[in-house]
Amino acid sequence: MDLEAKVKKMGLGHEQGFGAPCLKCKEKCEGFELHFWRKICRNCKCGQEEHDVLLSNEEDRKVGKLFEDTKYTTLIAKLKSDGIPMYKRNVMILTNPVAAKKNVSINTVTYEWAPPVQNQALARQYMQMLPKEKQPVAGSEGAQYRKKQLAKQLPAHDQDPSKCHELSPKEVKEMEQFVKKYKSEALGVGDVKLPREMDAQGPNRMYIPSGDRSTPAAVGAMEDKSAEHKKTQYSCYCCKQSMKEGDPAIYAERAGYDKLWHPACFVCSTCHELLVDMIYFWKKGKLYCGRHYCDSEKPRCAGCDELIFSNEYTQAENQNWHLKHFCCFDCDNILAGEIYVMVNDKPVCKPCYVKNHAVVCQGCHNAIDPEVQRVTYNNFSWHASTECFLCSCCSKCLIGQKFMPVEGMVFCSVECKKMMS
């Protein structure tokens, strides 16, 4: 497919998850409705990952595409219908007999993902070493956590130009080259094994003999004995704590087999979240999730959340923006040359700020313009003017004066306070 055809095919899946309830806003959100170019809900401004959207097939397609044309093709299968690669995630079902008074019942636990190892006991041990709230048991908080991290750590728009908004043919080509490069140089999947199983593959680690020190004359006599008792000492690359014998460890091939991690320590060096499904990106001695690896390579638009492949973009408030996406977060009007106010790290135009976000003056009960001076005490604000910041009893101007605040009112003296009580 040529570039022009690819560009024409691009578009965001606006019907996907439509109407799904927001897990964060609850009934305050009318249901998920994807913004035209932002990756958020138009109704509540939360991301799709915060909504109860059924995305298992879509996520499996996304990860399958990530592994396409890599050494990890064993983790994908192509659908016969359309040839699209699908992620063959390992689902683990454990059955535990539960003794009852009269008979024995079976308690079944399903993990929506588990490390693809033949030894189920090892996989189970791996899961038990994760925080309980992050264990991907079907229907649990941990399963929701995994779903959220899949969306956050591995955005589809970081690897698939068709998931981006209005890329030019030149930008499509640059993105494809970028994806090809990180697949060959950084992408990896962790491997769960017992540390001693890797001795044959990895370089020799430090050996600590049972004896402490010996004289040269005694070395020969002690050599055989120390060889029998010496043990390999392993430590976690992240927390530097020692690994317990018999506990599973995670290896990252790109990092080298002289490094290993506790299951709970295999995290992104930027966001410090568990690397979802052990999918990592390795760069300069650090582990990254997909999102933060890409952030270390390319600027990301704070408006649409996509990587910027254009040479022309703007920087404002320590963030990067496509020129067309430096817009008001409320009304989407372009802010170039306009007055704006940052609200929760999002730029808002002056009219929208006054309408939706401005604090109300306790004196005149009107919104306080963002460019106007104000007086603030606790959660109350006043225009810093002789008409608004007055004693609630005698109307004396309190600018530059001591005052006594009482539940949204201010007084110039104890006497005035008593008169109003």
UniProtKB/Swiss-Prot annotation:
Instruction: List, alphabetically, the CDD domains matched.
Output: LIM1_Testin, LIM2_Testin, LIM3_Testin, PET_testin
Q: Which GO terms describe its cellular component?
A: cytoplasm; cytosol; focal adhesion; plasma membrane; protein-containing complex
Q: Where in the cell is it found?
A: Cytoplasm; Cell junction, Focal adhesion
Q: Does the keyword ATP-binding apply?
A: no
- Listed Basic and acidic residues bias regions: 155-164
Instruction: Identify the keywords attached in UniProt to this record, alphabetized.
Output: Cell junction, Cytoplasm, LIM domain, Metal-binding, Repeat, Zinc
Any one of the GO BP annotations: negative regulation of cell population proliferation
Quick one: where's region Disordered?
A: 133-164
Q: How does it assemble?
A: Interacts via LIM domain 1 with ZYX. Interacts (via LIM domain 3) with ENAH and VASP. Interacts with ALKBH4, talin, actin, alpha-actinin, GRIP1 and PXN. Interacts (via LIM domain 2) with ACTL7A (via N-terminus). Heterodimer with ACTL7A; the heterodimer interacts with ENAH to form a heterotrimer.
Q: What is this protein called?
A: Testin
